[in-house]
Amino acid sequence: MIDFTNCPVNRFRAYGGANGNKINITYQGHSYMLKFPPKPSRNRDMSYSNGCISEYVACHIFEMLGFRTQETLLGNYTDSRGKTKLVVACRDFTEGGKRLIEFAHLKNTCINSEQNGYGKELSSILEAIEEQSIYPSDELWQFFWDMFIADAFLGNFDRHNGNWGFLVDEEKQQAELAPVYDCGSCLYPQLDLERMKNVLQDEAEIDQRIYTFPTSSIEEGGKKISYFDY
């Protein structure tokens, strides 16, 4: 297990998102976002959720499925209070001057859309895929549905317009799909070992996780899409 405690911290790089604290470190000459485990919102018996493990495992599964995916490393970090936590390091894929543009930001440029960039309605997302002009729409459409299928396989309940996108070089006027990232909501991160065991021993619990939940964060008619229905 890698110990990231003594890695140099870049205090001038900060990150958004509500899923755990994050800092920027340098490890073996490269920039990484270090993600800390968030407190679970549902399972009060857990000190921290398994989001870091989910991030690491899900990203590697995406990679095995043929997706270009962010590089992730599991490790630990001891804070100033002496508390050691399991963390995941996500390599900065904007090294080299490219800029990440979330799909939400690109969708905001589609002035014919009825919703803003973070609008979750499937029809609005597909319209934006057709209307945007920085990437071939047929390839983007294919990527969107491939990612949707992989997210369904991994039980990702939080893939939204703000956690996938493009790497852009404005000077060269070029865009490419960003590696898949932000997979910490896959693989039921708030299930502890005992509850995992209970699910695996109960066919009704397994069926619920196939047919009922998790749902996609994308909506149709204002209702979250059932992965099974697609």
Identify the function of each model-found stretch.
Residues 2-4, 38-39, 46, 130, ...:
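Residue-level signal for well-ordered alpha-helical segments
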Residues 89-149, 171:
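ATP-dependent phospho-/nucleotidyl transfer catalytic cores
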